[in-house]
Amino acid sequence: MALWGGRFQGQASALFQLFNDSLPVDYRLFVQDVEGSIAWADAIASVGILNADECSRLKAALTELLEEVGEDESAIIGSGAEDIHSFVETKLIEKVGDLGKKLHTGRSRNDQVATDLKLWCKASGGLLETKLTAVIQALLALASRELDAVMPGYTHLQRAQPVTFGHWCLAYVEMLERDLSRLADALKRLNTCPLGSGALAGTAYAIDRHELAAALGFGGPTLNSLDSVSDRDHVVELCAAASVSMMHLSRMAEDLIFFNTGEAAFVELADNVTSGSSLMPQKKNPDALELIRGKTGRVYGNLVGILTTMKALPLAYNKDMQEDKEGLFDTLDSWGICLDMAALVLEGVKVNRDNTKQAAQAGYANATELADYLVAKGMPFREAHHVVGEVVLHAISKGQALEALPLASLQSFAAVIGDDVYPHLSLDECLAKRDVLGGTAIKQVTAALAAKQQQY
């Protein structure tokens, strides 16, 4: 049954119905639509539209419908209803007859769907906060296991300076904490209730919108009916928060994919998150990580989609907004499964400490320490930088590490170099000297890890 039609003499074409109907997407708002309808029954009863018995019967029927349908999406999608609101109202009328037709008094699908979607976002946001926290905890557990494993840090994907694997883990903890903060901000801003805004001008009945908002778990009501029914900022913000977080997950996935290559062999991934080849028996592919990386582009596309949909819409509601849900649902689903997979991957990561240490020792990652040594001897840093560059070039030509060069060879570049230089070129010294807040010294990483573990 359509919720409109008196104005029309002709029937909608089958093609238009297929094009117009949103139930295959918005069926996911079923629980929220019923919850909003129960609260709305109380609201219109408070202003005399329903008597106490009518209100009680409507609420009982809605609760019964909620229990009957549960999570059986096929019971909704196969109904042939135009949208989730039509489905609920039709089922309600089947249960209580004409009384069901009174429920929509003073309410529009415009404020109804805006409310449903915000309720859904609130519930989904809470689940995503839990999933983000689980990835953080997995990173902290990995950092604890591999706290002092020495590895090369990279810039431009070239070995730069030695760091620890624990430090690498905590870098992604910082990123995911910002993701948590962004999500919390978005959830805070959407925590206002549009119900009672009507189609665009506000309901004609003197309901208490503060009470209605509280009944649905919102912090308060929205304050402008035009904005209330046409606002989809929360969709944009959640898609944006997901996009930034997916960027972080994709970067982490790329790091681990590289670390897992035969060329690096820094880590091994567990069997339960990898797959093989139908042709090459030896292959163990990092599919989980590659799919995280791949789904990032999909999430970005959904963000661009909703921004493009909203960019030129006049006030207030327009049917274009029906396109808000599919991308949002897909985005939060994709984000959620990627968070789950990231946590699972991290749980099974094994670090090959011998390989990471050998890689840190190669590539002249201790060159900065030699420059700092020269600075301590009184040489200006820019001059020291140039001298060490020459030393590195010489070492490359000899096929030797800096610490393997004879003292006489080093002194040929800078006479101030003494035999006390060699301890400064060790990996342990390179790490220990980064004993500053945020640095990679074991002492700093240990303290940072302990602080994070107290939080999570």
UniProtKB/Swiss-Prot annotation:
PROSITE patterns xref list: FUMARATE_LYASES
SUPFAM superfamilies: L-aspartase-like
Any one GO molecular function term: argininosuccinate lyase activity
GO terms under biological process: arginine biosynthetic process via ornithine; L-arginine biosynthetic process
Annotated catalysed reactions: 2-(N(omega)-L-arginino)succinate = fumarate + L-arginine
Gene3D superfamilies reported in the protein's UniProt record: Fumarase/aspartase (C-terminal domain), Fumarase/aspartase (Central domain), Fumarase/aspartase (N-terminal domain)
Cellular component terms (Gene Ontology): cytosol
EC number: 4.3.2.1
Keywords: Amino-acid biosynthesis, Arginine biosynthesis, Cytoplasm, Lyase
Compartments reported by the entry: Cytoplasm
InterPro entries, sorted: Arg_succ_lyase_C (IPR029419), Argininosuccinate_lyase (IPR009049), Fumarase/histidase_N (IPR024083), Fumarate_lyase_CS (IPR020557), Fumarate_lyase_fam (IPR000362), Fumarate_lyase_N (IPR022761), L-Aspartase-like (IPR008948)
Pathway, per record: Amino-acid biosynthesis; L-arginine biosynthesis; L-arginine from L-ornithine and carbamoyl phosphate: step 3/3
Family (UniProt): Belongs to the lyase 1 family. Argininosuccinate lyase subfamily.
HAMAP family named in the record: Arg_succ_lyase
Name of the protein in question: Argininosuccinate lyase
Species for this entry: Shewanella amazonensis (strain ATCC BAA-1098 / SB2B)
The encoding gene: argH
